[in-house]
């Protein structure tokens, strides 16, 4: 447990220990004392525990703050934990600053610019293109009317005329890139006229029924009506086909009926056609109503 130390006076100053244990000094030098359980001492003093050592350290820190003394005079047990150095503090601050700057840069990267400017620019470009097309081609449908007129007049040369005007339109579009908006309407009407010219030039041998030929330039509604009428005629012709007569039906099912009757007679010794019992395994009796 340690060595026994008796209370003594050093340089006229008294040094003593009391209670749970402590150290005091007077004059120039002082010595720290530690309570040890002696056989003569009472059992109330107890043993130095962790709680007591922590209380001693706190008390010594308070004394050092009130009356600072030289580090050589302090006992080794009462030495307070070394405070963190300035370099460590600086490193921690730099790490915190680095983390903050990294987060700021990351948040800046994630930010997106609003697309309002892009939308406005596209609208302005569309308006400029429309104005340019109106200025360069004030009536684009006049060309279409001429194309349709040429296609309806000619029968054999219509396809060549249409293809020639297609080439002219393509060359105009390549020269003027802003002609794309009106080109969709031109293409739709132009395909209609092209289909009409091809209808006029189709030979009759390709058609299944030459009686139902339609005039060139007719709408698709007439073709739909004709197809529906053809379907009705086919259904009526199928319904009016020759149906089998009753003797033919009897001849068709007679073989299967005879086989079933034979099997029934052999099994139950009863004639189902004449409704008469036959000699055999079962005995049949008539039930009175």
UniProtKB/Swiss-Prot annotation:
Residues 1-31, 56-160, 227-248 are annotated as: Disordered. GO terms for biological process: negative regulation of cell cycle; negative regulation of cyclin-dependent protein serine/threonine kinase activity. Keywords: Cell cycle, Nucleus, Protein kinase inhibitor. It comes from the Eukaryota. It is found in: Nucleus, Nucleoplasm. Belongs to the CDI family. ICK/KRP subfamily. Binds and inhibits CYCD2-1/CDKA-1 complex kinase activity. May target specifically CDKA-1. Its main location: nucleus. Residues 56-80 have a biased composition (Low complexity). Residues 13-28 have a biased composition (Gly residues). GO terms for molecular function: cyclin-dependent protein serine/threonine kinase inhibitor activity. It comes from Arabidopsis thaliana (Mouse-ear cress). This is Cyclin-dependent kinase inhibitor 4. InterPro entries: CDI_dom, CDI_dom_sf, KRP. Expressed in leaves and flowers and at lower levels in roots. GO terms for cellular component: cytoplasm; nucleoplasm; nucleus.
């Amino acid at each position: 447990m340690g060595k026994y130390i008796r209370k003594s006076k050093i340089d006229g100053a008294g040094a003593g220990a009391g209670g749970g244990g402590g150290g005091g000094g007077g004059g120039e030098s002082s010595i720290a004392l530690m309570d040890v359980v002696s056989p003569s001492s009472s059992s109330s003093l107890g043993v130095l525990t962790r709680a007591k050592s922590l209380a001693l350290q706190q008390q010594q820190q308070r004394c050092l703050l009130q009356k600072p003394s030289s580090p050589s005079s302090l006992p080794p047990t009462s030495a307070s934990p070394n405070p963190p150095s300035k370099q460590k503090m600086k490193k921690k601050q730099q790490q915190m600053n680095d983390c903050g700057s990294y987060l700021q840069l990351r948040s800046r990267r994630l930010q997106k610019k609003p697309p309002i400017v892009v939308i406005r620019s596209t609208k302005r470009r569309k308006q400029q293109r429309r104005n340019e097309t109106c200025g360069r081609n004030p009536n684009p449908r006049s060309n279409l009317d001429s194309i349709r007129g040429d296609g309806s007049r000619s029968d054999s040369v219509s396809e060549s005329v249409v293809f020639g005007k297609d080439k002219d339109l393509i060359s105009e579009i390549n020269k003027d890139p802003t002609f794309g908006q009106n080109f969709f309407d031109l293409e739709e009407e132009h395909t209609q006229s092209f289909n009409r010219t091809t209808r006029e030039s189709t030979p009759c041998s390709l058609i299944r029924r030459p009686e139902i030929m339609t005039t060139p330039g007719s709408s698709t509604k007439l073709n739909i009506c004709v197809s529906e009428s053809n379907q009705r005629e086919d259904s009526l012709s199928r319904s009016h086909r020759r149906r089998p007569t009753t003797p033919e039906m009897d001849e068709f099912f007679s073989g299967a009926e005879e086989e079933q009757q034979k099997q029934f007679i052999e099994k139950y010794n009863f004639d189902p056609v004449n409704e008469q019992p036959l000699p055999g395994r079962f005995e049949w009796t008539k039930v009175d109503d």
